[in-house]
Amino acid sequence: MKQNSNIPKITMTTNGYRLNKIAKQLYNYGLDGINISIDSLNRETFKKLTGHDRLPEILEGIKILQDLNFKNIKVNAVLLKDINDTHEDFEKFGNFIKNNEIDFRFIELMQTGDNLDYFKRYHVSATKFTNYLNKNNWVIQTFGRDAGPAKNYLNPKFKGKFGVIAPYSKDFCKSCNRLRITAKGDLRLCLFGNTGISIRHLLQKDDQTEELQDLIMGQMKFKKESHYLELGETGLTKNLSTTGG
């Protein structure tokens, strides 16, 4: 894809399944970054959450990428009440990144159109994790204009970084620089917005680029300053699996 287009950077989001089998291929094909979902480093807890016992394979895949000097590795975990939100859990993830150049990010559980019961049961504020960071000498990192929604924290004793994505925090949307495209080809100005417009018809040919750009720029004036998740308004998003970053 990179060889035949003007796309300068390609990253991949994955649950890590078969990563130990394809890590070398991904590296050789020129992948620039990888985001891997690991909600727990406890093997039994991981198995209960995912329904499979593949944590060792996923960690092996990460090790293979590191041995290849692959730098841009991010690990994401959804912060879940009574599952991975204890001091011991935070310490375990800290030990994981202490000697590894890995960005580990906790994502605050978000309500969507179809997960209200799950959200009520497992949501816990991201401040529980940020309080831990502040008490343990982690310092927030200044971020550039092209940075994502995570606030990153550094500690001189650790090679890796901690990050937090806290959509319910004050001014979370203030620095938003994201648009979303669903699997069906709909442009969403906000992950939790109430409107969307199809751009699928403009993704068919190379000579449609200018028309596509004009459409997107025209839609930008409708981008709102904030979502309304704190009011329980989840917009068009029924579940996050249909929407890309």
Predicted feature residues:
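Auxiliary Fe-S-binding modules of radical SAM enzymes
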Residues: 92-99, 109-245
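Radical SAM/AdoMet-radical enzyme domain recognition
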Residues: 1-107
